[in-house]
Regions:
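Conserved phosphate/anionic-ligand binding catalytic regions in large, soluble enzymes, centered on
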Residues: 48-61, 323
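Short acidic, Gly/Ser-rich segments with clustered Asp/Glu that frequently serve as metal-coordination loops
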Residues: 54-57, 256, 264-270
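N-terminal beta-rich core of secreted/periplasmic extracellular enzymes
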Residues: 25-38, 72-83, 89, 120
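Conserved, mostly hydrophobic/aromatic
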Residues: 52, 261, 327
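Internal helix-turn-beta structural module
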Residues: 304-342
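Active-site-facing alpha/beta catalytic cores
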Residues: 7, 66, 79-244, 265-266, ...
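Acidic (Asp/Glu)-rich catalytic clusters
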Residues: 40-43, 70-77, 125-130, 213, ...
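N- or domain-start disorder-to-order transition segments that initiate the globular core
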Residues: 1-43
Length: 342
């Protein structure tokens, strides 16, 4: 094989034993799990707001950001359930660039997967301890989910991963909401097929075990826009797009029809400052169609302490080193506006 086997990684249980969570923290996570479950089952009318940096690059800045979210959550708790994005591993379009804290716990140092694995678990635990939030992360590497399974309340499967067999089958074995993004080319039938696979039981190999999943009734759609054959961004958050997804769900017979709409990526044409307008348009659509209102369970927004983005060695505290994000002032104002619209 054309690779070097550098070292054997500790098992998920070994890492959990080294960095455990208390019974109180476990119960806090369960409370968030129950609240999210109610939203995706339709027994709660609150909006799930999955919001945070494109990538969790620095522990101190991420913690400060999420502490600010906690204060806002208390003011909007009757209308919105905030689930912070703590994305610790990043897919890269060409494979180049910063791949997240899992790969590089220090963005300016060489990759160290063992240190990264420990760093991401410690970060999620610190967030839970200091804010009470259990968070969302992307399931980029399915077999790594078990390292964080006791601290995550939401998982997204990205546009480049959604057709992958192991991602789909692993999603079928989780007991939290899993959002399946439409692929970068925008084919919604691919996304619907992924949700179908995730909602059904399967037997497969996971972490050197033969496992039997039960199926995940909380698997759902994420609309993130698409790139057409010319490479141009095309949004899929408009009223007619949501109406089409309602029809696809009706035809599919899937459990608990639901969508979370990503306001950035191809939906914004990578113009991050458009996210507030897009988010408000989506909520207006929910008010004009009862069917769309039932379907839309949440929004996904990329936000950090500072507007925009910088290079990994840029040095601006709280500014994204991957995709550009909304800064805090715009974020806070937007959350209150969304609560008023809800």
């Amino acid at each position: 094989m054309n690779m070097e086997f550098k070292r054997k990684m500790p098992t998920p249980q070994a890492v959990k034993d080294m960095y455990p969570i208390s019974a109180d923290l476990a119960e806090q996570k369960k409370e968030t799990d129950r609240a999210l479950r109610d939203i995706f089952l339709g027994t709660s009318e609150r909006l799930a707001l999955i919001i945070g940096p494109c990538s969790a690059d620095r522990e101190d800045a991420v913690l400060e950001y999420i502490c600010r979210l906690r204060e806002v959550q208390e003011r909007v708790k009757d209308k919105i359930l905030i689930v912070p994005r703590v994305y610790t591993n990043k897919p890269r379009t060409t494979g180049d660039g910063y791949k997240g804290m899992l790969h590089q716990p220090d963005p300016n140092s060489s990759p160290d997967m063992l240190k990264g694995l420990i760093a991401i678990r410690k970060l999620h635990i610190r967030v839970l301890e200091q804010t009470g939030f259990s968070c969302a992360d992307e399931m980029l590497y399915p077999e790594n989910h078990h390292y964080l399974s006791d601290v995550l309340s939401y998982v997204a499967v990205g546009a480049r991963s959604v057709e992958n067999q192991l991602h789909r089958l692993t999603a079928s074995g989780l007991d939290i909401p899993v959002g399946m993004k439409n692929p970068t080319g925008g084919n919604l039938s691919v996304m619907i097929n992924s949700i179908t696979a995730a909602q059904h039981p399967h037997t497969f190999v996971y972490s050197s075990w033969e496992v039997q999943s039960k199926g995940n009734p909380l698997a759902h759609a994420i609309l993130r826009g698409l790139a057409n054959k010319h490479g141009r961004s095309v949004p899929n958050y408009h009223y007619e797009d949501l109406q089409l997804l309602c029809e696809l769900y009706d035809q599919s017979g899937l459990q608990n029809p639901a969508v979370v709409v990503d306001t950035n990526h191809s939906n914004s044409g990578k113009h991050w400052e458009e996210q507030p307008r897009i988010a408000k348009e989506i909520l207006h659509s929910t008010r004009h169609s009862a069917q769309i209102g039932r379907l839309v369970k949440g929004l996904m927004i990329e936000s950090y302490l500072e507007d925009g983005c910088q290079k990994p060695d840029g040095g601006v505290y709280g500014k994204s080193i991957t995709d550009p994000c909304l800064g805090w002032k715009k974020t806070e104002r937007l959350i209150y506006e969304l609560a008023d619209l809800r």
